[in-house]
Amino acid sequence: MWGVGALALVLITGLSVFYRAQVGKKVVTASTSVNGQELPICSVQTGKKQIAYTFELSGTQTGKGQVEQMLQILQQQEIPATFFATPSWIENHRSLAIQICQQGHEIQGLGEQVVCVEQMTAKACRKELRKIRETIGTVTEEPGVFFRIPGGEYNNEVLRTIYACGSYPVAWSVDSMDWKEYEAGELVRQLLQSCTIRDGEILRFHGEGEDSGEMVKLLHPRLKEEGYEAVTVSQMVYKDCYRMTTDGRQIPEKSK
């Protein structure tokens, strides 16, 4: 049904949930929870100075100009990025979605709307994942296997459903707070002051935010000076043989 032949077996222990799924012809195994609490992927222990820029594109937003400006900045800065887009955004901006992929970025799935985490069900999640995969398939041959729920709130049922369907829930470890009504320079200052960037950080931006592009233009050169390289979520996240920490950090069980 999912195009990846997903099958999951969850084994619950006192400390973690071990997940086995068949994706295509490969069986993957991972521990996706801590103390019975399922966790989305927020960052990755890469062993390399890598970071992933992610941008959210919602169907309720109309800032085409901001997205085009962002693409120019990403090209100038030589940053490959991951765009989490809703099905409605892709349908309403199909040519722009194709342009995103043609410029070396990737499109992954974003839930259509923010809902109370208690209202999320496995059935609704499966339906949304199916719609997202079908829609992403209209603009790129690359499968959409990463999924983000708006607002970043998950529950165990939804997370287990995402994993069981052969997908990976991805949140973030660094929030740009680009929705705040501050100048880009001040937002960058606050970001660097509030957190210490480490390898495998997943940075969250709004692709249609008025200050998002300027923030990236100011932030990335500073991180580049410190030796950080930008990669896509697909290039950074482990698909197999990993465990999670309490803050949603992927730890490899063996070499990638």
Predicted segment positions?
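Active-site beta->alpha N-cap acidic-glycine motif
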Residues: K26-M120, A124-T138, E142-G144
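Short low-complexity, flexible loop/linker segments enriched in glycine and/or proline
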Residues: A97-I100, K123-C125, A184-V188, T245-R249
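C-terminal domain-boundary segment and adjacent tail
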Residues: V34-G47, Q72-E78, D211-K256
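Hydrophobic membrane-insertion alpha-helices, especially the h-region
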Residues: W2-F18
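A cross-domain feature marking catalytic cores of carbohydrate-active enzymes
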Residues: F55-L57, F83-P87, G109-G111, I149-G151, ...
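Alpha-helical scaffold elements lining the catalytic groove of polysaccharide deacetylases
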Residues: Q61-Q66, V115-T140, E153-D199, D211-L218
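Hydrophobic single-pass membrane-insertion segments
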Residues: S16-K26
